[in-house]
Amino acid sequence: MGLNKSASTFQLTGFPGMEKAHHWIFIPLLAAYISILLGNGTLLFLIRNDHNLHEPMYYFLAMLAATDLGVTLTTMPTVLGVLWLDHREIGHGACFSQAYFIHTLSVMESGVLLAMAYDCFITIRSPLRYTSILTNTQVMKIGVRVLTRAGLSIMPIVVRLHWFPYCRSHVLSHAFCLHQDVIKLACADITFNRLYPVVVLFAMVLLDFLIIFFSYILILKTVMGIGSGGERAKALNTCVSHICCILVFYVTVVCLTFIHRFGKHVPHVVHITMSYIHFLFPPFMNPFIYSIKTKQIQSGILRLFSLPHSRA
């Protein structure tokens, strides 16, 4: 198979049939974009500069915030360009790079949530050994493994995109590049590119979810063995924020997968809207979840803006 010699650009798509409303759709998406940047940026700033937050739990939270920022910064510039400027053209190289980062960061987010579940598991099940198990070095190693696993797992299918000829329509179905959209336009044998992502989905994302699920069964079993009701509530509260983030991420994954697999007769705009929800809702919600449910983050925000706060 030779290097791709077909036309060098793809055409991105906003909301088909709603082109006259693109400027209005741009406004809430821009607001969400700014909120995500501010929310996750604030979390990263707090964790970096507040010594009270220099603990494994918050280092993992910083990884989640950085991943969410990465997803947003990768997808939203082309979305806003399409909606406001009608800038639909994107080169093959830029498109494939965008697809690589979008899919890598999605797998990485699943890995970070698994790492956070491990942190919660150690906190509840082995509190006396917590500091000896989750040292700064160990946290760094976990972060590198999560990043490496995600980056290497996505690379094979994206590398192959550079070699496919594209002789069909060059119009993509979203305002950003996704692997599954691009391969539909290829005039070549795409069997590997169809099957490999399914393997990644089951071997990584689904496996991550199952490990998280069973770890929380063990956590719940430990918590239920605590005699005091107050201590049980305190122990559960330790992991409430993480549980909320897990639900936000995996529910959107399940909904998006369901729509793509079984929604053949669903209007295309529903597919597009669900994609935006999948990529924007978790990064938008995660900072709010941790700000509302975690007292240390609340205190850090109040200190950042020099507001008096109760120590109760």
From Swiss-Prot:
One GO location term (cellular component): membrane
Alphabetized UniProt keyword annotations: Cell membrane, Disulfide bond, G-protein coupled receptor, Glycoprotein, Membrane, Olfaction, Receptor, Sensory transduction, Transducer, Transmembrane, Transmembrane helix
Positions annotated as glycosylated: 4
Ranges in the topological domain labelled Cytoplasmic: 45-52, 119-137, 216-235, 293-312
Transmembrane segments: 24-44, 53-73, 98-118, 138-158, 195-215, 236-256, 272-292
Coiled-coil features, chain-numbered ranges: none
Compartments reported by the entry: Cell membrane
One of the GO biological process terms: sensory perception of smell
A molecular function (GO) term: olfactory receptor activity
Disulfide bonds: 95-187
Extracellular topology ranges: 1-23, 74-97, 159-194, 257-271
PROSITE patterns linked: G_PROTEIN_RECEP_F1_2
Main subcellular location: membrane
Its membrane topology: Multi-pass membrane protein
A Pfam family that the UniProt record links to this protein: 7tm_4
Functional note: Odorant receptor.
Sequence similarity: Belongs to the G-protein coupled receptor 1 family.
Protein name (database record): Olfactory receptor 51B6
Name of the gene encoding the protein in the UniProt record: OR51B6
